[in-house]
């Protein structure tokens, strides 16, 4: 009995390792520089060289001004957002955190929705988004 459990446990560990290993991307193992040149489909000389250029004071000032303009425009845009008007409450509705099984009317809060759990046996109105 213990031998069969040990065998099954070993088999389970092997299968877990095999599935995890099969989902990993294959690693390229190149032995030397010659195989790198022969196996490489992209020649490194095809890419242009990178040149590093120092910025002068004028270009730094211009880039700072552009960054400040972007920051101020983002602040103005965030201040311009206005909360949308809420719809008037209808009389037959379900309050937040109360039961709202499907034959019941909709939730009173426009940001709330009816969420059911346990195969639609326990349903309640819940607010999902705080920014609504």
From Swiss-Prot:
InterPro entries, sorted: Agouti, Agouti_dom, Agouti_dom_sf
UniProt-annotated stretches for the region Disordered: 62-85
Signal peptide: 1-22
Record key words, sorted: Disulfide bond, Glycoprotein, Knottin, Secreted, Signal
SUPFAM superfamilies: Agouti-related protein
Gene Ontology molecular-function annotations: melanocortin receptor binding; neuropeptide hormone activity
A Gene Ontology term for the protein's cellular component: extracellular space
Residue ranges of domain Agouti in the record: 93-132
Cellular compartments annotated: Secreted
GO BP, one annotated term: hormone-mediated signaling pathway
Domain notes: The presence of a 'disulfide through disulfide knot' structurally defines this protein as a knottin.
PANTHER family: AGOUTI RELATED, AGOUTI-SIGNALING PROTEIN
Name of this protein: Agouti-signaling protein
Name of the gene encoding the protein in the UniProt record: ASIP
């Amino acid at each position: 009995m213990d031998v069969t459990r040990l065998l099954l446990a070993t088999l389970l560990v092997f299968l877990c390792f095999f599935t995890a290993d099969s989902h990993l991307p294959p690693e390229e193992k190149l032995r030397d520089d010659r195989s790198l040149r022969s196996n490489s489909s992209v020649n490194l000389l095809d890419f242009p060289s990178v040149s590093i250029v120092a910025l002068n004071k004028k270009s730094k000032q211009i880039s700072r001004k552009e960054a400040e303009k972007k920051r101020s425009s983002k602040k103005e845009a965030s201040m311009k957002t206005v909360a949308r008007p809420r719809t008037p409450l209808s009389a037959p509705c379900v309050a937040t955190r109360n039961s709202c099984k499907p034959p019941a009317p909709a939730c009173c809060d426009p940001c709330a929705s009816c969420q059911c759990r346990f195969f639609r046996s326990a349903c309640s109105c819940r607010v999902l988004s705080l920014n609504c």
